[in-house]
């Protein structure tokens, strides 16, 4: 009996539980649909290490992504000066807000907001809170140059901290002109981490061939967004990318390869000889990736508010910031004096700042804080806290 051909495409690799490995794989029949009769016995996996030695592994699970399977999405937003033209920034914000509102309705989904101009800004770490995500999107304003590669590199590093289905979706309206990281740096890191990059380009200044090549090399795709109705075009593209990722199957196996876990391997996923289907796909990955969450080669600012110890900030100035940035700026004042933190996002963030040294536990510092802070700092902390209260910041419910 002739076998039914299948088209296989490995979009991403989750190696967070290595030696157990999960391949997020598009499995489609000739009609473009995922067959309903898939099971693990119909597939085989063979790993090839850097020396060419081959090691078979048993496929333990082949299942479509269920509604409850978590997705981790890093949404990268261009805030360079060219985004001022034709209300592109407003349209991009509307589309991004609409997307995250829908995305977080699925239990387990989380997103992070990254924006960029000359610098890269972590506007909001991964969360399922629509309020925090929309606050981050609202805080983005256009100015400066276009450090797209830095932003993508940063987003890959941050997304690599998550387990499960992971994807970076970037929006850009101009050509890269300000990054420390190179195109090859981004492609290499995407391939190392197994995280795909999808890119949406808008306007005539976009280098389409370069971005298409980048997205393709990163197992993603490139989209053109019509600028005449940008908000609607972006909403449709974001939904298409989301649907594409949700159409994947999880192919799970446990590696038997004894080689170096830091060297690139090739995994061959094939339909088994005894099964009803025919098809195969190879994919390279690195079993264990030691990737920092915040890399110093990326241009990011040392302080949220560098002069909060010498300037009184008005409410109108501070209200332009996202809830995460307010929370960060308030705790940045404490961090300058050596306070430690219980919140893991704060701990991760300040650990990358060369100026930061923890001197006190949170409890020790809170007992003496009134004598440590000057008048500017005390007033700024009070104003930030009042704004956070008025905006019902979820961060007020978390450990500092």
Per-range role (PLM):
Residues 71, 77, 88-93, 97, ...:
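Exposed acidic/Ser/Thr-rich ligand/metal-binding surfaces
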Residues 1-4:
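Proline/serine/threonine-rich low-complexity linkers at boundaries of modular beta-sandwich domains
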Residues 26, 73-81, 116, 303-315, ...:
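Acidic/histidine-rich, surface-exposed loop or edge segments in extracytoplasmic proteins
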Residues 204-213:
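Short, glycine/polar-rich helix-capping loops at beta-to-alpha or helix-loop-helix junctions
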Residues 14-19, 216, 223-294:
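C-terminal "exit" segments of structured domains
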Residues 317-358:
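Amphipathic alpha-helical packing elements
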Residues 341, 348-400:
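Compact alpha-helical subdomains of small soluble proteins
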Residues 10, 15-74, 79-88:
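Acidic, polar low-complexity linker/tail segments
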């Amino acid at each position: 009996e002739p076998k039914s051909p299948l088209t296989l495409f490995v979009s991403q690799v989750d190696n967070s539980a290595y030696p157990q490995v999960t391949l997020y794989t598009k499995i489609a029949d000739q009609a473009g649909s995922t067959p309903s009769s898939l099971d693990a016995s119909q597939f085989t996996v063979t790993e090839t290490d850097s020396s060419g030695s081959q090691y078979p592994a048993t496929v333990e699970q082949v299942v479509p992504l269920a509604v409850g399977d978590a997705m981790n999405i890093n949404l990268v937003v261009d805030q360079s000066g060219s985004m001022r033209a034709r209300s592109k920034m407003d349209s991009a914000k509307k589309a991004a807000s609409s997307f995250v509102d829908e995305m977080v309705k699925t239990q387990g989904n989380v997103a992070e907001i990254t924006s960029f101009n000359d610098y890269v800004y972590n506007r909001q770490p991964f969360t399922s809170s629509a309020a925090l995500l929309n606050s981050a999107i609202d805080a983005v304003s256009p100015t400066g140059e276009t450090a797209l590669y830095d932003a993508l590199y940063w987003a890959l590093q941050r997304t690599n901290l998550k387990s499960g289905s992971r994807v970076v979706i970037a929006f850009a309206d101009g050509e890269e002109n300000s990054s420390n990281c190179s195109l090859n740096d981004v492609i290499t890191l995407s391939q190392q981490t197994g995280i795909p990059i999808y890119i949406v380009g808008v306007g005539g200044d976009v280098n389409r061939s370069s971005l298409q090549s980048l997205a393709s090399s990163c197992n993603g795709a490139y989209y053109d967004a019509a600028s005449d109705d940008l908000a609607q075009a972006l909403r449709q593209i974001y939904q298409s990318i989301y649907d594409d990722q949700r159409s994947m199957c999880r192919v799970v196996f446990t590696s038997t390869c004894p080689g170096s876990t830091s060297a690139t391997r090739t995994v061959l996923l094939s339909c088994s000889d005894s099964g009803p289907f025919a098809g195969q796909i190879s994919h390279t990955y690195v079993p264990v990736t030691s990737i920092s969450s915040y890399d110093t080669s990326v241009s990011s600012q040392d302080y949220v508010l560098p002069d909060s110890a010498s300037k009184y900030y008005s409410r109108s100035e501070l209200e332009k910031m996202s809830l995460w940035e307010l929370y960060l700026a308030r705790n940045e004042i404490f961090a300058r004096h050596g306070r430690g933190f219980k919140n893991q996002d704060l701990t991760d963030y300040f650990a990358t700042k060369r100026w930061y040294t923890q001197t006190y536990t949170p409890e020790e510092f809170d007992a003496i804080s009134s004598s440590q802070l000057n008048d500017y700092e005390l007033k700024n902390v009070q104003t930030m806290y009042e704004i956070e209260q008025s905006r019902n910041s979820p961060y007020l419910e978390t450990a500092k």
